[in-house]
Amino acid sequence: MIANKYDLISKIGAGAFGAIYKGQNIRTGEPVAIKVEPLKHETNLLKNEARIYQYLKGGTGIPQVKWFGVDDTNNYMVINLLGESLQHNINTYGTFSLLNAIAIGVQMIERIQYVHECGLIHRDVKPDNFLFGLNEQRDRLYIIDFGFCKKCNNPQTTTPTTTPTTAPPKKMTSILGTPNYISISVHDYIEPNKHDDLESILYTIMYLYYGRLPWDTPGITNTEIRNMKQVLLYGAGTATTIPKIFTQFAYILSTYREKSNEPNYKSLLELLNMFTNAK
C-alpha cells in the first residue's frame, strides 16, 4: 500500500525510470495508474514529470496527478488510469483508416498546441506517447511522457511590419527523440522547436495509416532516414505516391517555419478538419 491510500494491483508497463502499475484508491475504489521510480535514479525524472503535469493541469487530454510522494526506496506518482496507446492499438488491431488517422491527428495537434501555449516543447512525439481515455473518455486522446520536455526557445522575433530575424539555430551533439518520428531538422542536429513537434505528429499520422514508416529498416543510418523523409514529403512526384493531405501538411509546416517561430496551428487544423468533414 502507498500513502495508506493506494493499492498496487498489477504491472502494466515499464520504462527507463522504473515501472507502471494499475492501482486502486482503497477509499473510493477509483482505478489509478501508479508510476514507481527507484531513488537510485539521479535524474528524478518522475518528480520532473509530476511537476510538468501539475503545470499543465486543466488542459484537455492532460493526465491528472492525484498524489506524488517518496519513501525510503522509491518516488511514486499516482495519475488517472488511461487506456491503450496508439502504438498498442496498431500492434493489437492493425492500422487505422485514413479518416480515423486524420481525426486522431486533430486531437494530437490540439494537445501539442496547448503544451506550446504553456511555454513547453514535448520533443518526443510518437504513438507510444498518446493514450486514449477510459469509459466516457474513451474517445479522448491524452498526451504523456514529458521526459524530454523543455521550455520553448524562440530565436525568431517578428513585428507586423518586418521580416522575421533569426538567430543561428542551436546545434546538438546527439540526436534527441525517436528516429522514426523526429523532424528533418533534428536529424541535422538542430535543437527542436515547436515546428518539430508538429512534424513528428505528421509522421505519427502516417504511421497510423500505413502501420510502418518507409524508413523503419534495421541498420538504416540517421542520414538515410533524413533523406528519405525529405524526398517523401518534398521530392518530385510525391503527390502520386502518398495521400495529398500529407504533402499539404508538410507544405504548411515548411512555409510557416520559414516565416515565424510560431506554427500555423489554425491552418493545420483546418486542413485536417476539412478532410474529415468531407467524408
Label every PLM stretch briefly.
Residues N25-K47:
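ATP-binding glycine-rich loop module of kinase domains
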Residues P169-V186:
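Conserved activation segment of eukaryotic-like protein kinases, specifically the C-terminal portion
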Residues L82-N91:
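Structural motif in protein kinase domains
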Residues I104-G105:
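Activation segment signature within eukaryotic-like protein kinase domains
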Residues H116-G133:
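Catalytic-loop of the protein kinase fold
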Residues A19:
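Conserved N-lobe ATP-binding subsite of Hanks-type protein kinase domains
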Residues Q64-N75:
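Short beta-strand micro-motifs within the conserved protein kinase catalytic domain, predominantly
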